[in-house]
């Protein structure tokens, strides 16, 4: 609990989880999320904690973690450190390293929040599978780049056949990218039928989100994101 910063899980009847908590936060969804946690290739967040440690932990520890995440989601009281992103700047080829705006910025969130969003991702995928038409492809499960190229070709032929302009809008919001306007994100989720309590969990962390840059002189001060 000291590492994760999660609230104490309660075992009394008054704290019995509701159906949406049962559906989203359970041991099975946690273990599926932990499969993405690997020893290498995952930079630690600002707290330095590696999610793969929870993957290696015994079952009773994972069960306790799930209970604490459920409690945090129920109260909308997530660890404050989950809202702080570690920012690393990587030079681009041929660009000056003295101009920070010319560098690529990599945002690393704490692994606790990463695991939590991976558990919530299944609910977002459920809504996406219901709303996205079967003819639309792209980077979706069981769909490859060839299908995406074929879809674009068919749309071009459709416009040519009809002799009219044809517009298609694609929004990729699945990765919680920093460039996504949050107000737009919340509105889209509401229109598509995402559980508002799930959106509230994401919003609770996003509303107080900040960043700290890793520099040659140590970590910078926090700035709001």
Where are these regions (language model features)?
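Conserved pre-catalytic core of RNA-dependent polymerases
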Residues: 3-225
